Amino acid sequence: MDGRTLGLWLLPPVVGGIIGYFTNDLAIRMLFRPYRPVVIGGWQLPFTPGLIPANQGRLARRIADAILGSLLTPDALHDLARRLLELPRLEAAIAWLVSLLLERLREVRDPRSIEVAADVLRDLAGSALPRWLRAIVRQRQGLDAQIDRWFEQQLLSQKLGPLQAQQLGDWLLEGAFPPDQIRRVMLDFLTDDNIRNLDRIVRDRTRGTDWVIANLFGVQSSLQRLRQFLREQPEAGDAVIAELSQRLALRQQLSQALQTFQLTDLPQTTLTDLRLQLRQGLRQWLDQDGLSLLEGALGGLDWTAAARALLDRLRTAVISDEAIAAFSHEVALILDQRLEHELEDLVAAALPILALEDLIIGRVEATPAADLEAAIQGIVRSELQAIVNIGGVLGVLLGCVQSLINVWSLST
């Protein structure tokens, strides 16, 4: 085999392999180069600058549309925000902020800083507490649950102490049911019909010697004389009732009864009605008078003294990491519950503020064409090397086919 025939066999595969292997690199270079327009004699050469530098603005918009349309969709951003705002991360962030705030507050000593802290407390309390109160009133189920829990855990198990029972007993006997009031109640009760009914009941239900006395004398005349006495001599009647109360030791007996009394002794229907009335009363009071009472209490506070006392307390108090962690956990739970319902709306509201499309377009347009070329070349060499190798193999195969065609044409 002479040199000419050997060249016909070897030259096409070698040339085809070289062309196929370096075609991708050449194509990428042709897309980017030249980076700037080439002007000769006031005339710009065609295809200068390269395809991508000449259309970098439009390319930036297409890249932004592709990223926001398929990669950074609102759902994807929502999932990303949800992962970023997981409960452990929220707890860690809140704990860090609390620790930093405590360190800064311990360094506050000058009067100007105290005044600033007082203004912050005033503004925070003036805006947050009324809003918190209105939110509590609006959340009827949550408020009812808190009232029921307090009613069952605190109110039902409460008992009066000896002093409290004595004071309440004194008020009942002297304020609610004084002798004069008891006398009036007795006069209202001792009507002619009630006296006759009492007399008949005594006659019917007595036995033995009591039956003889009841049927011979009865109680009608005695009750009528008692009514006449109470009506005609009110002061004497009041004195008799007061003396009778003292002789019967009603004050001591009432005090002992009040000490042993609990709300659980009442019927269940009564407790249910009491719970409902307590709910309604507290809710109505918070709705009508709670806000004005809160504003009045906040308006009368000395915020400067409160801020100074708070800072002194924070400066001297030892706050453990466990307390900060517990506080951070509770606050994180509240934020997590709110974010569960409002995160989608927050992400939707944040998208126009972030202006991701403008950011992507600006970054692509600001990137030099040489840097874009280097980035794409790096991706091709590291991630798409198989395509380069396939190009070389295809070039060799096509060269072999060309060699066969050349040899066949010579033989014919």
Curated annotation (Swiss-Prot):
Superkingdom per UniProt: Bacteria
Pfam families: DUF445
Keywords: Cell inner membrane, Cell membrane, Membrane, Transmembrane, Transmembrane helix
One GO CC term on file: plasma membrane
Disulfide bonds: none
Membrane disposition: Multi-pass membrane protein
TM annotation in the entry: 8-28, 390-410
Location within or outside the cell: Cell inner membrane
PANTHER family: UPF0754 MEMBRANE PROTEIN YHEB
Family: Belongs to the UPF0754 family.
Protein's recorded name: UPF0754 membrane protein Synpcc7942_1098
Organism expressing this protein natively: Synechococcus elongatus (strain ATCC 33912 / PCC 7942 / FACHB-805)
Lineage of the species this protein comes from: Bacteria, Bacillati, Cyanobacteriota, Cyanophyceae, Synechococcales
